[in-house]
Amino acid sequence: MNEVKQFIKKFIPLPSKKGEDLYKLTIDKMAEIEARKTPKAMLDYEVQLVEHCNLNCKYCAHFCPVAPESFLDVNEYEKDCKRLSELFDKEVNFIRLMGGEPLLHPKIADFCYITRKYFPNGIIDLDTNGILILSMKNTFWKALRENNINLTVTRYPLKLDVQKIKEKCEKENVKFRFFFEEPVKTFNLLPLDLEGRQQPEKNFYKCYLANSCHTLKNGKMYTCSTVPHIQHFINHFKCDLHICENDGIDIYKVKSKEEILDFLAKPIPFCRYCNIDKRQTRKWETSDKKIEEWT
């Protein structure tokens, strides 16, 4: 990297403020690319316990507004969790239990116990929009507390009793934080190219989801959260987007953790459907379930 920095300095004069800013921007972008194509040292993943949501944000990257009501099977998750635990010797960096809205799952406590059983040392977060927190049963709070699971709330422009939520978590001795201190005001529109005309490698290196939002779904690991949930979009809008075998890696066919980590750090065929250069920030709203929210 130092040799590259010296090479760049030959073309970007540093004495001016503009030159310094351009140099820093270039180095930062190169560092992002390097991070995306470098396999992680440890496992991290997110898993969607519920496909649907009780909020349904416009531009939702998990396509929850157009997803049918669906709950992750506890036994299937335990099977996958056990397999990953075997491959990674029970070591994990962090795990995110999410949705959809995970608090909608009637067996949410089971997922807390299962995840901690197979990964005793890693960080485990349960991500929620907070709407149902104050209505959760004692078994929920006990599961979080006994398994050292952090309750993470993303605040939206809703009437949530923030103080009561904080007090409840303190009373239950559950670790709690807001994902952002202020309510979300904007959402990212991540448009799809329905013709699949984009360059997969270029997209991968420019995408903040790539080799970051690792997702476990139905016995496979994915480099991002788009592919494992895109079927909801395809089914709802009757689109002909092709998902192939090589878009994810089967955790039961690999022989080592390195195979998984290496796969997650590489572009996949489905990357051609993401229109990275057209991504925009939009005002947060609830979904109208129109195709324009994702194209």
Model regions and ranges:
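Short, flexible coil/linker elements and helix-boundary hinge sites characteristic
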Residues: 1, 10-17, 89, 148, ...
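Conserved AdoMet/S-adenosylmethionine-binding subsite of the radical SAM
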Residues: 104-227, 232-233
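Accessory C-terminal segments flanking Radical SAM cores
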Residues: 192-295
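Soluble or luminal CAZymes and related metallo-dependent hydrolases
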Residues: 72-76, 107, 161, 199, ...
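Exposed alpha-helical structural elements
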Residues: 3, 7, 76, 83, ...
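Flexible, charged surface loops at secondary-structure boundaries
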Residues: 88-90, 144-146, 265
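Radical SAM enzyme core and accessory elements
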Residues: 1-33, 273-295
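Conserved alpha-helical substructure of the radical SAM core
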Residues: 7-9, 18-126, 133
